[in-house]
Amino acid sequence: MNIRNQQMMDWLQDVGLHSRSIAPASADASFRQYFRVRTDSGSFIVMDAPPDKEDTGPFIRVAQRFREIGLNVPEVLEQDPVKGFLLLSDLGQQTYLGLLNASSVERLYGDAMGALMVLQTGSYSDPDFLPQYDRPLLLTEMSLFRDWLLQKHLGLDLTDEQLRVLQDTFELLASNALEQPSAWVHRDYHSRNLMRTDEHNPGILDFQDAVLGPVTYDLVSLLKDCYINWPREQVENWVKGYQKLSLESGLQVTKDEKEYLRWFDLMGAQRHLKAAGIFARLYHRDGKAGYLADIPRTVGYISQLRDLYPELTPLIEIIDSIDWTAVTRVSRAS
């Protein structure tokens, strides 16, 4: 047993939890780890967030507020921010990703979009509770695609013209995000962070990076998921249905279907540039190769927009010139 695990065991004893078994529950794209602790009184989750690398404060604060507005997120039962340990209620082991198929998707996504509406309408009670998703952050995120995926991982020597195209497109996508109405944004609202629960489905995880930002961001995270994809026609129907629900719920969104879909699609391009860059960074910086296989799907969402948005053509030409089968060759430059 390593020192950190021993510290966790000692802390559990300190808070009066006597475990029958402890096993890894999951790890995410950060330095956090999660363990499932089984006791005579039930099952719990321990978040291990090393304090020199992770701050548990945002998780605690956001969890409390999200529970107050009616979302099914873990309850923080015990906390020690100094040591970096939280004891959480257990939302189970059934991720959306493991359950989604053609038969289940309408029901599961229906519940997820209902919860998303609770999140977005809840933001009107206190919009300043979360930090702004501003232009510098949007641009920094997209730069990960250039720096970590194209240059670091694929080893591309980008021309001045290609660099200009990338920067111009980054600015365009940031402007699209900022012209949208704002609501609370989970920021990773996808199938690996949604749990199927018997009551109050879905359970929602990994919300500590939430911000106040573009109203289509979480919707595109859900419907253009980096880990599972659906036919374009089906996605458009979901988007139109959610736009209608948004208007009925009083969200300040456009009534124009074409404009809303453009917001959604270009927001997706921003998110997918960021995500593809993060997947490459996770390999080179953190030694996590498992996300590399998701990069072709992620950038593929952008390529699918070729005939819909001429303003994205220069970016898509760069993307389509790359052999994406090479992305999983982890012997690349490190």
How would you describe each model-predicted region?
Residues 146-153, 215-252, 266-286, 298-305:
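Active-site activation/catalytic loop segments of kinase-like enzymes and analogous catalytic loops
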Residues 137, 186, 211-215, 261-269:
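Secondary-structure capping and boundary motifs in well-ordered enzyme cores
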Residues 1-85, 183, 197-200, 319-334:
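Conserved NTP-binding catalytic cores of kinases and kinase-like/nucleotidyltransferase enzymes
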Residues 4, 8, 13, 124-132, ...:
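An alpha-helical support segment within catalytic cores of ATP-dependent transferases
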Residues 277-334:
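ATP/Mg2+ or Mg2+-diphosphate-binding catalytic cores
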